[in-house]
UniProtKB/Swiss-Prot annotation:
Protein name as catalogued: Leucine-rich repeat-containing protein 37A
LRR repeat coordinates: 866-887, 890-911, 914-935, 938-959, 965-986
Source species, domain of life: Eukaryota
Signal peptide: 1-35
Broad class of the protein's primary localization: membrane
Source organism: Homo sapiens (Human)
Amino acid sequence: MSSAQCPALVCVMSRLRFWGPWPLLMWQLLWLLVKEAQPLEWVKDPLQLTSNPLGPPESWSSHSSHFPRESPHAPTLPADPWDFDHLGPSASSEMPAPPQESTENLVPFLDTWDSAGEQPLEPEQFLASQQDLKDKLSPQERLPVSPKKLKKDPAQRWSLAEIIGITRQLSTPQSQKQTLQNEYSSTDTPYPGSLPPELRVKSDEPPGPSEQVGPSQFHLEPETQNPETLEDIQSSSLQQEAPAQLPQLLEEEPSSMQQEAPALPPESSMESLTLPNHEVSVQPPGEDQAYYHLPNITVKPADVEVTITSEPTNETESSQAQQETPIQFPEEVEPSATQQEAPIEPPVPPMEHELSISEQQQPVQPSESPREVESSPTQQETPGQPPEHHEVTVSPPGHHQTHHLASPSVSVKPPDVQLTIAAEPSAEVGTSLVHQEATTRLSGSGNDVEPPAIQHGGPPLLPESSEEAGPLAVQQETSFQSPEPINNENPSPTQQEAAAEHPQTAEEGESSLTHQEAPAQTPEFPNVVVAQPPEHSHLTQATVQPLDLGFTITPESKTEVELSPTMKETPTQPPKKVVPQLRVYQGVTNPTPGQDQAQHPVSPSVTVQLLDLGLTITPEPTTEVGHSTPPKRTIVSPKHPEVTLPHPDQVQTQHSHLTRATVQPLDLGFTITPKSMTEVEPSTALMTTAPPPGHPEVTLPPSDKGQAQHSHLTQATVQPLDLELTITTKPTTEVKPSPTTEETSTQPPDLGLAIIPEPTTETGHSTALEKTTAPRPDRVQTLHRSLTEVTGPPTELEPAQDSLVQSESYTQNKALTAPEEHKASTSTNICELCTCGDEMLSCIDLNPEQRLRQVPVPEPNTHNGTFTILNFQGNYISYIDGNVWKAYSWTEKLILRENNLTELHKDSFEGLLSLQYLDLSCNKIQSIERHTFEPLPFLKFINLSCNVITELSFGTFQAWHGMQFLHKLILNHNPLTTVEDPYLFKLPALKYLDMGTTLVPLTTLKNILMMTVELEKLILPSHMACCLCQFKNSIEAVCKTVKLHCNSACLTNTTHCPEEASVGNPEGAFMKVLQARKNYTSTELIVEPEEPSDSSGINLSGFGSEQLDTNDESDFISTLSYILPYFSAVNLDVKSLLLPFIKLPTTGNSLAKIQTVGQNRQRVKRVLMGPRSIQKRHFKEVGRQSIRREQGAQASVENAAEEKRLTSPAPREVEQPHTQQGPEKLAGNAVYTKPSFTQEHKAAVSVLKPFSKGTPSTSSPAKALPQVRDRSKDLTHAISILESAKARVTNTKTSKPIVHARKKYRFHKTRSHVTHRTTKVKKSPKVRKKSYLSRLMLANRLPFSAAKSLINSPSQGAFSSLGDLSPQENPFLEVSALSEHFIEKNNTKHTTARNAFEENDFMENTNMPEGTISENTNYNHPPEADSAGTAFNLGPTVKQTETKWEYNNVGTDLSPEPKSFNYPLLSSPGDQFEIQLTQQLQSLIPNNNVRRLIAHVIRTLKMDCSGAHVQVTCAKLISRTGHLMKLLSGQQEVKASKIEWDTDQWKIENYINESTEAQSEQKEKSLELKKEVPGYGYTDKLILALIVTGILTILIILFCLIVICCHRRSLQEDEEGFSRGIFRFLPWRGCSSRRESQDGLSSFGQPLWFKDLYKPLSATRINNHAWKLHKKSSNEDKILNRDPGDSEAPTEEEESEALP
């Protein structure tokens, strides 16, 4: 109840007590309640209870004609506050509204009751109380009640009355009017809030009597007269006055009555007992039908009978409205009297007293609730029956439906109330269904609609009313006459009677009468047949004679003006149904669906709330409707009352398109909405009826009638407390389903459980009730709002055997089963339990019983957007299941603080690829498994404080990616004593480490100082920090990069430091560590002691708007360069995939920067032409490198896009169900302009800004062509550059299909089309010895150039179609797991760069072995239309002409990355696609982990990034992935610079894996990779160089020896023959010829002496030389020995000898 309603209750109480007759009424009500407690009726009216406080009676009178729907809440039941409690605040509030009316209306109403012959309360008492009320009431209040004003009101309402057929009702005697008034009073507390505005307006329009007159006349007058003539006046005067007033009241009051009635039922139900003839009338909103879609339900649980009559005539529209109305109906149910009133009524005396008051006051509300008004006429007819035979007459909403087509109302008085519902199936069947549903709910009690309310309301009444209810209900048969009687046309006699009996308490009156008279009368008159005048031929009547709450509803066929025969038949059924008496006082009244549904065709609903009652719904087929003809299937619970609902087939027949069943056990309303099939025959199935075990049965009119009008939707709501529910539905041969009837929201707002698929079959319903747990009455309303949520198990709900029977049509139409609803409730309602919004799911501050025990898994459609922040703080989560994060793949921030986690496993966070913030503080974590954080490559922050971690074992922070982004780690407040994980100290980006309040030793500090070189802030335990502070000066002197911040506590602390000896020793290990740190890092480290109030939490308020990993264009483009080659390698359409994300930030760039692109195209050309120019540019223009790179990228991307469109068919766009134009359209037109993201991608803005502007969509090449032509001049250079770059890239990839960009383009300059081995041999040492900067530059620049060529090349050129395969060259591609053998064979075979496809020859030209991915053999992706080829089909031997990788959008779910190639059977095409990517990338990326990451990112980008809401997130993921690859590559470059190895090494070895396992695995991979891709380490290359050098040396030596040998062969000319030694074996001719050739060659430019150098000497010459030498020597001797006198001249002889 709203707060506004509570004041209304107070007002009501004050007024009730203010009235004199109330004490008498209270006494009588108490007496009646003791005998039989009848549940409040639900009045299913367009009007809902309003929270508005009751105005003074004067205001009522003054505004009688314009009573707002809320006004009905005038103080009605002042009797006892506890009565109000039973009713519920809303009920009480609503009940007060009628008091103004009650003064005058009660008197006639009481008289009517007396005249009707019902149990008259002691006339003196009633008269006294009513007279007192009259005296207290102002004349204005009396005026509205006066029949004259009522007549005036009918005059005003006459137009409506004519439409509905009110004319006849108006013609009916005043007794009918009084009856209506009584009914209005009983239904006086409708739910005004639920009334549609139109209804409210109408209610306002009538003069004072509109609400007051109608309801007040009926109720106030009878009550005023109650002491003496309560019964008489009701029967006579009300019947007399009613005819005149009915037309007015029926139109205006139905709503008000419905509104007021709910409030009144609780108390008034008991008071109504004083008015035995009071019936609860629910008039379908005939006049208020103009207010479509607003059904009101009024329930007076305590000892209240409900009369519901609905006319189907011309209510087909109304039925549709009603179908819609049920949606509103739930609203009414929650606030409405059902919940509110039911609780208030339990006290017997107050309820009786209040009921009468409510009846009096309810007239004010009848105007608001047309349904109630309708019921009132029916009630008028009902008075004709003896009070003992009190019937609840539900007038079909014929006339009122005309006005309130969409607002059916149902009144139910569960306890000891027999309910007769007569409804005309004509077009109103839908409405009647609504009434039936409403009635069913009403039976539960005020809160019946909301299951809890029923429990509250019902149970209190049950004890008293149960006893009384049984007999009273049986004796009193509430007959629901078609609303025509309300109109005073057809049912006028019946209505007059009903009114006479139930004039004041259409709802209460019946209940009160039931309570009063039922004890004696119930057994005798179990069946009450209300004959409907021929005018009501269309109305179906349902008589319910519960023992305690036997409820029989028999719908009459439209043609049947003779509803009475139908009702006669109905009585026959009611006795069966009456068999068990409800343990609970509650009675269920279901208006015939025909009547109410006719009026409210859109929203038929049957609500049955039973405490211990069986509810049997027997639809009586009218000749016209035919739905009544099929027998009802009744399921009788053995112990509990049996509820029979209209056969699902009937309901289905009319609601063929939708069937819903809502079951709310205990106080839960059971809503059954069967999908009616056109077949009317289902009724046969309905025929089956099981007698209730011992509980009264409630028979509802066949849902068929209601369905006929609500063809698309019928709703039955049953709220039992220990009851069995039997639902029998007869399909109407006539199916008049308004197409909107399905929309009738079968979902009662208060229903805890909704069984949509098979409501008709009681099996499903009762079963569902058993399965479902009934929510507490106080929580029912909340639960009702979510139909899928099941709040509690039914108390003791036993399904009848017949419930197993379901109509075929219903089974066919069933969409969900009860178990499915249960399942949905656990996952679908996360956003109801938690807070969803702004990309955040917050499940905090929950009640202890609601707190989460495990991570909730939402349904895919639960939330339209994505959750980037998950906050599960303060729950009871103790374990994290695997794959639980699959639905949260985009989460960046996860808070699991203050839960019960005890351990973390390596799969605890599997699937959170994008996670950056992880808060696990204040749990009970004791151990962390190795590789726990490996699934989180982008993690930046971890909070593990406030746990019970005692050690960090080896591998805790081990991950293949090395935790490259982790910069903050909090470990404080843990009993941490040992840190054995070296990976903690080696975290490359760690800048903040908090180890405060731990027990770590000094050794840990040493390791941190020595190994964690990037650490900037370290928080130590206070004792250790203070110990260091004692040597602050020494430490800072030794290592200037370490700064100690000592607080005052440390400076004054003189405690002995256990580490003093080690720290204070200048030559100790600690000082050496400091010196070593100073040598290899310049990062300043601040060491601080822990703060006394240290809080481990970190304020990340701006976390959601976090920047991308790269802040400028150069970084962004450079990061993309590391992943673009992989996209082309797997034949993905890079342009269509990446451009949307690259273009996202373009909106933030300045136009001036974009204009510089054209000027720098020449620079791009130079960049692309070769590595030499790149090196120069790198060294000369490092500062401008980023800008040029971006410009080059832009030019190349544009060229690629344009050239590709011109030369080849447009590549097929990534399929996006949400958009026809593809991702680029999204990116161009619906780009997020998030400032943070714009800044992050600021670099890419200029790159593709013109392109994004010029070609917003790649799916429209025709539009792009003109722009291509316009740019032809600008693209000239870029195209030529790309062509040359493509050739180099192709050659590179041909010889080395390696993943890393650096490797690919390492040898552009020297690459030749030869085998890999030959290429390696010819490498120049200079190339191998390039500086680290040069290699890094090549990796960053040239790869991206090549990638750009991949994007821009035409389909038939290198990297055609961005890697798409050509059908001509590779017609077949059998995809399977790539084995090393295949890769080796393929690479050796296809070494020549034949064309661009050679780079992918390892996949294109090979038949891969089968069986590797046998799990996927059955998967064949549906081919997609594409001009280039067929879609990629996966299988053991799948053939494809072109690998487009175009998959349907599977969703955003991301499966965990596969651990190996032995994948389990996959559940989605996305998983299979990822496997294929992994296999394709195997040769490019030998490292399994890197390969899986790249495959996963590509799969995400391809299949999960189509939605506009994930564009930014996808762009972030791409940027982070590229940044990660850049960091990993940089680390490998550092290693390469140290050991002079080639960049290919990174493929052979894992990046970070330094463990023994990684090393052993690395060796195996190295051997395999040597086979796959010829490549050698430094050692192998050195050996090879030495070998080559040796071979060359040997060759040179051999050559020299051969030449010498040839020269010496010439000595053979010597006569003596010169021995050739070892060379004599050489052929002579060969040697001579060679010598001649050599002589010929040497003849040019050689001196003569050199020619004869090796010429052999003849023997003569030798002898001559020897003689000369000998002679010379002898001559020298002579000269030395000659005497001085000797002649110096030689002798002639000597001279002659000397001559030759």
